[in-house]
Amino acid sequence: MNLAVIGLGKLGLPLAALLASGGHAVKGYDKLDLVRSSIRSRNIETNEPGLMSLLMNTADSLEIVDDISSAIQGVEAVFIIVPTPSLPSGHFSNEYLLDAIEKIGQSIAENQKIVIDVVSTVMPGSCDGPIREKLESATGKKIGSQIGLCYNPEFIALGSVIKDMEFPDMHLIGQSSEWAGEVIERALGSIVKKPVPARRMNLKEAELVKIAVNNYVTMKISYANSLMQGSILLGGIDIDVVTDAIGLDSRIGHKYLKAAAAYGGPCFPRDTRALTALYEDLGLSGSLSLATQRVNESHTKFLAQRILSAVDRKASIGVIGLSYKTGTTVTEESPGLAIANELVSLGFHIAIWDDEGAGIGSDGDSTKFQFVSSEEELLALVDFVVISRPLNNPSRVAQLLRDSNKPYLDLWRQF
């Protein structure tokens, strides 16, 4: 198939590379000149496992172009993965998406049969509302037998994007018509490593499924964390014994039923807030998603208070793990950063070491913390250590903690 990918960021580039490795002729476009030139030269900065090897093997099948009209020319489907940032209300902004849709629509040839596939996460009602309107206005044609519209969000995590795309639990496809959904299902089917169930439905159903899935996961995390809080206050309870037993019930299961740090990252928090905002728009309470948010926010404060009760007020505290998960340097709404900020607000000096090499993003204040380059340097500086997420080499950290005899709190109980 002849395909295009618009937006070559952390998700778009892996998808483009996978489609190109799946036997398709793929054209990729990003509005940033530096991104395009870096990909052309295969000289990109990434720690996404498997991405560079894919790029090196797709020199003949992945073409980077300099404008959207060149990307759209002659393709059967275009995948759009541009940012849909969260607004203060919790809703997603469609500004960048609608701009891309307009340019794509204006570039479609008179007799070209094409499917426009929105991969970016959007609010329910977006595809049948402003996105459809913008596309039909730009093309001068109704969505139907010649132009199809699909919504196909990815369920992935940074640090395992390639693996998550190759081994998904399902392909979720919202479709304007059967033929449009078939085109997208066929393209996605070429990149998976095992048979995957596809669920094709109308556009609004798929939009709701995307944020509902992530809301269920965050609800499960907050449920486990609320149990942890109660267990600590009750005393004499091993929370892992409790959640292990609960997870054996087939109606519940063990996945994400782990009491640890608060949830974070670029997807979980914003999808949870979006469902709350949606329910408020509908005149419903949205109490479950709102409660999930509130438990998550209170959990970091609860953990900080437990640390406060265990150390001297003049103690220096080290935080190991700044990125929101193992395998990435992204710190967006990371639990480690949240704990560090909370401890600073309580008056503690905070030193940070991250085994992924993460630093504070552009939206954070790095001057509040002391960054160190190794575990040994951290342990030499602090009186108490907090481990905020799973580590790449927990046994090494465990040995260093034993040797230093430093007290610590491992939120994930890795050793």
Residue spans of the language-model regions?
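Structural/interface elements that position substrates and couple domains in central-metabolism enzymes
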Residues: 1-415
